[in-house]
Amino acid sequence: MENCDDLSSDENLPPPGDHRREQSQERARVGNRDESVSSTNMRSIGGAVHNQQQLYWTDMYNGSNNLENFWLCFSGNTSLADDPTVQSDSSASTQSRTNQSGTIAQETDNRNASNFPPRSTTRRGQTYESRDESQGGQAPSHQNQVPGVDRDEYAGDRSNVSINLPSVDQWREYSFSDNSFQGESRTVQRRSSRATHRVKNQFGSIGDGRTSNNTSLQEPVIQDTRNRNRSESSSTMSSQSRTEHAPIFRLQYNYQREADNRSSRLVQIQGHSAPNNANGLQNTGGQAPDIGPEVNGQSSDTRAMNMGNQMAQGDSHVPMNFVPRPLSNGVPRLHGVPRLVDMYDYELAQRAHARRYPTSNMPYGFPNAGFQAPPHMGLWPNNQNADTRAMNMDNRSRDRTFQMPPANAQVPTSSLSGLFNSSINHGSGNQQFQMGQSSSGSAPQLPALPENFLMAHANSQIPTSSLSGLFNAMNHGSGNRMNHSSSGPAPQLPNLPESFLMAHGIGQVETRSPAGPSNSSINHGSGNQQFPVQQSSSRPAPQLPNLPESFLMAHGLSQIQTSSTAGPSNSSMNHGSGNQQFRMGQSSSRPAPQLPSLQESFLMAHGIAQVETSSTAGPSNSSMNHGSGNQQFPVQQSSSRPAPHLPDLIRQEEEFLNTLEFEQFARRLYNDLLPGVDPNYDSGTSTSETPVLKFSITLKAMLYDYWRTMVQMQYRGANINFLQSIINLNARSAALNSSNARASGSADVQNQTVSATVEGADDASANVNALSDLLAQSFPRQAEGEASRRNDIDHPEDDLNQADSPKSDNQSDKDPPSN
């Protein structure tokens, strides 16, 4: 561990009362060790008149488990007024210290740290050196020969007052022959007069700048050089060394020695508590066991956070930095003594496994734990402390109930009865908001979250009221589920901006139901995120916003408004990915649902027709499935349009479509309508096979409908008007040129019944024979409805030549001629 810069008297000391200079000197003495020094612990040591001022700096441990080597750097006074050993000896030293205080302050006022001569003392091969003038005031290379400790651990400037504790087995108490250490004196073991004379002989005449190279001193003496200008006799120094010392502090702490077979040693220094950056459980919140010594009857463990702001008084000293050694049973132990944290981990792991909780995935945390903490295993004598790592949200320092660590939210509960159904699943997956509510208590309130937060999480701030009884857990993340009772006002969705609605493909829906629960829900986003909303009868009917046509086209949706005269509505809108649905519970106050007038190109592109079926009673069974998955549009329809239908074919008629007789008729008619176009162009069928026309089902049905009409007229003996029938057929075939039929072969267009009104004919057999001749005739120009698209049509055959077929999808987009 690196050494600390010692707090020496090498700097210029201001006269008593000059606090500004005192503070500047303190900063100079401390150096760059700002991170380890607290401003509240820095005190002035300007003179003896400031007996209550002290400078105590302990730099030890510093985040390492090895306490074998450290420096105690201190200077000045220490408050030992409560120590009974001090009071008996304080009066004897107060007078002598006071008499010399003024002289010390003035003699040391004009000194410069760079003028100090080098000094060196040794004790059993251990060297203590100070700065040398030849090195520009820098610390020379140290020659510390400490058993079991590397030299590099003692690197640093030790020209100031410092104490090295090389051996924890043998503790000695060293003296300081310095009158400026004006603390309340304490009865300590003092050096003999002989040792003091050796100190004098070693340093020579300090005031003259001479240094003795005597290295035979057996006691490690660290001389404060602020007294170097004083010429004192040996008896004077001996008298001072007995009475005017800075106290030596003891530390009581358990640590592991890494360099000596990891054997445990006991170090005891009485004074302040342990540092606050010591291997510690910084994310703790309960009352901690004491590791620091007691100060004025109070022990303050600085590593553990105390949410209750209470000092643990009289608690036992429980070590928390043992290095574990696992045994066969899985409980880490050190010399047969389990660590508190390891014992707690083991116990909680056993209980979590017994309750089928997930195993903890954190070294010292239990993200899935929420159960009662295990007993303290007898390690705490008073059994008053909670786990040091547990959060204590109710500010009770001695709460033994295990609280969730910071990985989870700590939600306090009250008035819980029955099964405990509260669950919070934080993260990804099945995060849910489940709220069981009654009408007996005040409503929980969500905080007023900012709009950008709501936008980022795609959630709406939904206030609730009159919630109590069952636990209402709200899990933040993806997914809200809220069940409301009828005792409070209905929840309101906020007025989300239009851009938000557009981005998520949802509309701001408000629903109302006169009685009973509502089944309306809004599911948007990914997965099973839903907004079930309980509605009252105080709000208007839900309305979908007027979304632009481009949005509807992109999502394959239509703006649907539904209503039902009785019972709930079964209309739903499913869009996006998966089973996301829009379900709306409707009342009888709204008009019937209507399909919008979608563009014909949209219908053709999706392979669906705008279908409306007439059903005077019962739900509608018409559905539209498009896109991916099970996205459906069940639509309640009215009877405002006639329903398109295919000809009703019996089995014999369907078989007739594949007969040679119908093929001959269809081929002849087809060739007359589309001359030069082979319907079997790329069919690959051989001549040996029956050359069945590769007409679409719709075209074959249309041709058959015409055929059946002709046959029926023949059997009736009706007078068929060939010209009118061909004109009607021409109009039907021209419809195949339209963009609607060419885009997808929609049944809405192609399945139109060829209502060829044929009047009168004596011989029906002549109809088919004369069909090709009649098709070649010129028909009168049909100007109405054609002027806007065609300037001139000299030959109606152009329309027939451009009629659509399965292999002529790129024909012109002409509208059907009006007759």
Swiss-Prot record:
The protein's role, per its UniProt record: P granule component, which acts redundantly with P granule component meg-1 to promote P granule segregation during embryogenesis, and germ cell proliferation and differentiation in larval stages. Together with phosphorylated meg-1, promotes the disassembly of zygotic P granules in the anterior cytoplasm of pre-gastrulation embryos. Together with dephosphorylated meg-1, promotes the assembly and accumulation of zygotic P granules in the posterior cytoplasm of pre-gastrulation embryos. Required for fertility.
Regions of compositional bias (Low complexity) in chain numbering: 232-241, 427-442
GO biological process: P granule disassembly
Bias (Basic and acidic residues): 17-36, 783-794, 806-819
Protein name: Protein meg-2
UniProt feature, compositional bias: Polar residues: 83-128, 135-146, 410-426, 469-489, 516-540, 614-641
GO cellular component assignments: P granule
Biased composition (Basic residues): 188-200
Region (Disordered): 1-46, 83-160, 181-249, 409-447, 469-497, 509-548, 561-594, 614-645, 777-819
Location in or out of the cell: Cytoplasmic granule
Keyword set includes Iron-sulfur: no
Principal cellular location given in the protein's record: cytoplasm
Keywords assigned: Developmental protein
Keyword Acyltransferase: no
Disruption of the gene: reported phenotype: RNAi-mediated knockdown results in sterility, and in P granule segregation defects. RNAi-mediated knockdown increases the sterility phenotype of meg-1 vr10 and meg-1 vr11 mutants from 15 to 100% and from 4 to 93%, respectively, and results in a larger proportion of under-proliferated gonads than in the single meg-1 mutants. Simultaneous RNAi-mediated knockdown of meg-1 and meg-2 results in defects in P granule disassembly in the anterior cytoplasm of the P1 blastomere causing some P granules to be mis-segregated to somatic blastomeres.
Organism: Caenorhabditis elegans
